[in-house]
Amino acid sequence: MKFALFSVLVLMLIATFVAADDCPRICTSDYTPVCGTPSGGRRSANRTFANQCGLDSHNCLNKGDTYDKLHDGECK
């Protein structure tokens, strides 16, 4: 009985790690800005992200509000 309970707990733990998203949640504080433009032809302003990791993290966590990299540097 103990082995069965232990096995179930291990499987649940593995499933939790597999189901976890792979979004970067912690980015460095290096300020190497990138300008992003809304994906999919949305009509909203370009947005400056602190770095590429910030843009990637935003896109991963906000599937309906993604940005494509327009260029390095701040948006004008």
Curated annotation (Swiss-Prot):
Residues 22-76 form the Kazal-like domain. This is Vasotab-TY3. Keywords: Calcium channel impairing toxin, Disulfide bond, Ion channel impairing toxin, Secreted, Signal, Toxin, Vasoactive, Vasodilator, Voltage-gated calcium channel impairing toxin. It is found in: Secreted. The keyword Signal applies. Disulfide bonds join C23-C60, C27-C53, C35-C75. It comes from Tabanus yao. Residues 1-21 form the signal peptide. SMART domains: KAZAL (SM00280). Expressed by the salivary gland. InterPro entries: Kazal_dom, Kazal_dom_sf. One of its GO terms (biological process) is vasodilation. GO terms for molecular function: calcium channel regulator activity; toxin activity. Vasodilator protein that inhibits vasoconstriction of isolated rat femoral artery induced by phenylephrine. Since platelet aggregation and vasoconstriction are key hemostatic responses, particularly in small wounds, this protein likely participates in the antihemostatic responses during blood feeding. Blocks L-type calcium channels (Cav1/CACNA1) in left ventricular myocytes isolated from rat hearts. GO terms for cellular component: extracellular region. The keyword Secreted applies.
